[in-house]
């Protein structure tokens, strides 16, 4: 069975209550549930992990390599603009990934315009809200089939 890992970065545990005008009203639990259901329908195993700690996300990426995960969907959140270490972990395991952002990072503050991940990602989805996760998953399902 094919396996996908969804990684959520810092503060995404607050989705649903954190700045809903920017990030929407859906909780992380709701987003994960929708993704798991969509993957199940396609016969793919999907697991989700969220952490506010960079080291834990890096360890999850390392474990994904050991577990032979086929694809990663990642919303690095604030680590998008700061984490060379998380980028290096993704490069090291060589698992293809799609970078997702709920908001359009290019229409926000200037410091959010740079991503340490976009140039090594298979694709980037930014600004489509929670639909971005689903679109990433649908693209991966098509590729894995």
Swiss-Prot record:
Quaternary context: Homododecamer.
Main function: Catalyzes a trans-dehydration via an enolate intermediate.
Any one GO MF annotation of this record: 3-dehydroquinate dehydratase activity
UniProt gene name: aroQ
InterPro entries noted in UniProt: DHquinase_II (IPR001874), DHquinase_II_CS (IPR018509), DHquinase_II_sf (IPR036441)
Top-rank taxon, per record: Bacteria
Positions marked as site (Transition state stabilizer): 18
One GO term of the biological process aspect: aromatic amino acid family biosynthetic process
Family, per entry: Belongs to the type-II 3-dehydroquinase family.
Organism, as annotated: Legionella pneumophila (strain Corby)
Residue ranges that the Swiss-Prot or TrEMBL entry lists as coiled coil: none
CDD domains per UniProt: DHQase_II
Keyword Lyase: yes
PROSITE patterns the record matches: DEHYDROQUINASE_II (PS01029)
Enzyme class, spelled out: lyase
E.C. numbers: 4.2.1.10
Name this polypeptide is given: 3-dehydroquinate dehydratase
């Amino acid at each position: 069975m094919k396996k996908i890992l969804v990684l959520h970065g810092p503060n995404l545990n607050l989705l649903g209550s954190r700045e809903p005008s920017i990030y929407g009203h859906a909780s992380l639990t709701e987003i994960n549930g929708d993704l798991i259901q969509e993957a199940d329908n396609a016969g793919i195993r999907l697991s989700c992990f969220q952490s506010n700690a960079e080291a834990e996300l890096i360890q999850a990426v390392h474990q994904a390599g050991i577990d032979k995960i086929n694809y990663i969907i990642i919303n690095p959140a604030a680590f998008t603009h700061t984490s060379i270490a998380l980028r290096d972990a993704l490069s090291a395991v060589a698992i293809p990934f799609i970078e997702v952002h709920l908001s359009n990072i290019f229409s926000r503050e200037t410091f959010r315009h740079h991503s340490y991940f976009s140039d090594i990602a298979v694709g980037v989805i930014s600004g489509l809200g929670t639909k971005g996760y689903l679109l990433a998953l649908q693209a991966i399902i098509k590729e894995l089939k």
